[in-house]
Design a protein with these regions (language model features):
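Short amphipathic alpha-helical surface patches that mediate protein-protein
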Residues: 48, 64, 68, 86, ...
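Conserved C-terminal alpha-helix-loop-beta "cap" of PLP-dependent enzymes
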Residues: 93-262
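Conserved PLP-enzyme active-site core in the AAT-like
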Residues: 1-104
Length: 275
């Protein structure tokens, strides 16, 4: 109840469910749901071509136990999760300097609904990138959240959390603001840059390319992915034009501590571009 419509109810043919994040099963376990228009036997046949022949029965049993628990107690459990998440939102917003996004963002069009169990917090107003707050929470307060990016952190409230965990998170954020806040005017203003696609990703990926220092790639066409992980959303993809703003964004993300993935050069000092 009081949650966004799920993928299958919205008419999806197939949907993956990360049970290890929200349902209480062990890490690496998830479910693949199939709708009435999909032949699940055929899907299983195709999956068997690539998946291991030595399935982990520890993971499978944890999925089954979690499935049963959600069937028996799921509505009550997620009701508590929503209450804890809304409480966390109120407390974090009362600190000042942070903004925990909520249902007030819904506008009926570009933001159709909002999942309150995802506690996303804007951090730039205290002069810290989300990844910096993420690192502080992990290293100084022993709190592991989902991820941090240039301007936000994401904490995933699940059925395994308690109100004491929420209090620890809120207290840590208040402490971080008091001890580590900086002048926000030094922060990069851009959160996301929409690149221009000029070549299909497939053609760009397989085309002849060369590696250039990142500062020399402005105006060239990228032939590889560049992304911060987590969350793993590409900053650049094959076939997209590299601009100065994108270069500045990548360098800024590196300086703030984002884990960069995708390029052939793991340090992202060079980027592969089409010849």
């Amino acid at each position: 109840k009081n949650m966004p419509v799920n993928a299958m109810a919205a008419g999806a043919d197939m949907a993956s469910v990360s049970m290890h994040k929200s349902g209480g099963s062990l890490t690496q376990s998830s479910l693949l749901l199939t709708g009435p228009n999909v032949n699940w036997e055929y899907v299983s046949q195709i999956i068997n071509l690539t998946q291991t022949t030595s399935a982990s029965y520890l993971l499978l049993s944890s999925l089954d136990i979690s499935r049963r628990n959600l069937y028996m107690r799921g509505e009550a459990s997620f009701g508590k999760v929503q209450d804890m998440a809304e409480y966390a939102r109120e407390e974090i917003n009362s600190i000042g300097g942070f903004y925990a996004y909520g249902r007030e963002l819904k506008n009926g069009s570009s933001i159709y609904d909002f999942d309150v169990t995802k506690l996303s917090v804007y951090t730039r107003d205290i002069g810290l990138a989300g990844i910096e707050v993420y690192d502080l929470l992990r290293d100084e307060y022993d709190i592991q959240i989902e991820f941090g990016d240039i301007a936000n952190i994401l904490a995933y409230i699940s059925i395994g959390d308690r109100i004491q965990d929420i209090e620890r998170l809120v207290g840590a954020l208040a402490d971080i603001k008091r001890l580590y806040s900086k002048d926000p005017s030094q922060m990069l203003n851009t959160e996301y840059i929409a690149p221009k696609v000029v070549v299909s990703p497939q053609k760009a990926f397989y085309a002849k390319d060369e590696s250039l220092p990142i500062r020399e790639t402005a105006g060239r066409i990228c032939s590889e992915f560049v992304m911060c992980y987590p969350p793993g959303i590409p900053i650049l993809a094959p076939g997209e034009v590299i601009t100065k703003d994108i270069i500045d964004y990548i360098i800024y993300a590196k300086e703030k501590g984002c884990s960069m993935q995708g390029p052939e050069d793991p340090d992202v000092n060079n980027i592969n571009v089409l010849v």
